[in-house]
Amino acid sequence: IIYEHFGFTPSTNKETYATRSFNVGGNVDGKNILSNNPDVVVDFMTTAGTDSPDQFAFTNQPNHLVFFLYSLFKDDQELRQNFLDFCRVQCFAQEQAISEERQRTKRIFQDRAKDMYQKDIKPKFRDLLDNCPVISGQDILPQSVLGNSKNKERYKVAITYHLQNLYRSAGLVDDLEYPKTQSELASKILLPIEPTLLDMPLSNAEKKVKDFLDRSPHDVTVADIVRQFAKVPYGWADCCSIYVVNELVRRHLYAYNYNNNPNVNREDVARNIVRDASRFTIEPAKAISQDILNAFIEAWKHIFNVVSIK
């Protein structure tokens, strides 16, 4: 029912939000039905220790999106009994028939159960899925968000809200400035450094990465940055995280050390940084003298025929 109603299948267990896709896992009453290593988990609960969505939300894990069917399911005695009978028939059908008469009996029960499933159980469960409370972490989705959405649309609205709620800093790199592919990243790494960049304020994404680097008690590699900013609350794509690091290097706040070589040119960075992220260590940059900066600015003005730099 869940697979059909929400389009929730192993072949569609990824959801894209901001700059990357996330693995989606699924549980029915704690039993895994989808993905073993998920970023987010969708739970369908027909039983729980409380029938209060608010109380259940209080102990819910942050990355879990819950369709809390129990608060409605527990009050529908007819559905509960029919579902129990249906499950019993399925168990009975698995038993080996010891006679032709018993086999006929099994077929009769199976046909009745199939009819009950199609006419009663399935429609009512679909209705529960479309009307039950939905919980994202410790927040109950407001009706203003869910609206009158049904079926796959309701699931899409809920999972999008959940990803927004969980990865609240994903939008920091969801902009045209940031590369979407490795080739775009390489092109941006190879761009010449304009002198004005050194005086421009840091972006919010750059501030986050710089703060992480400044607080780290040990050497940090580009791979460490990628892992850290793929986590909650960021959820950044690898290319975006590497781009932010590289912008801090271009500002001369940090420098790369590649395979114990501190003198790394842009071409080597562009060619190798994605593949060898664990071999690129990020170190504080050495101070540049004012004379060198002035000479660089004068050379840049001469090359590009610029009279002054504001």
Residue positions per predicted region:
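Extended alpha-helical interface modules used as scaffolds for assembling large macromolecular complexes
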Residues: I1-K310
